[in-house]
Amino acid sequence: PDSFESEGYDRSHMRLPECQNRLIAEILEVQPNTVIVLHNGSPVEMPWINNVKGILEAYLGGQAGGAAVANILYGIVNPSGKLAETIPVKLADNPSYLNFGGGDKVEYREGVIVGYRYYDTKQMEVAYPFGYGLSYTTFTYSNLQISNTNPTEKDTIIVSVDVTNTGSITGKEIVQLY
């Protein structure tokens, strides 16, 4: 239903339909080795988060989304994505929660303390932080080099690092620098 996910529609909550949460709970009763695949356009509350073996956030994968999910679940492709947003535990943890304008009105009253900065500043627990992502393999970082450790506003800084796959599975890594 539109109240849960629809193009051009803002939700007033982060819940999944309760029938989906009940289905997940019932599946977990008979099969605790369960991985949940989410197909959603924005974060959702996950009351079952501590009871599942894994969660694959597929977002809205489009035409090839199903094949991509299958390739990850069957180990044909190594997952290498990182979250581009922080996933809060619940809607009330979101900094814009009290400022939801409704309809076609958007209000950003958080100032510069938005997204992951808000959660870091408030030292809040989140379901998953900005930049989080798992892999079937492991990587080591070495030889970090920064061209200028005391830059001015006009300076260009070049950062380089060597990334080595130390696991037994072929994979790609996204290097993150903040």
Where would I find each of the regions flagged by the language model?
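C-terminal non-catalytic regions of proteins with extracellular/luminal or membrane-system context
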Residues: 1-178
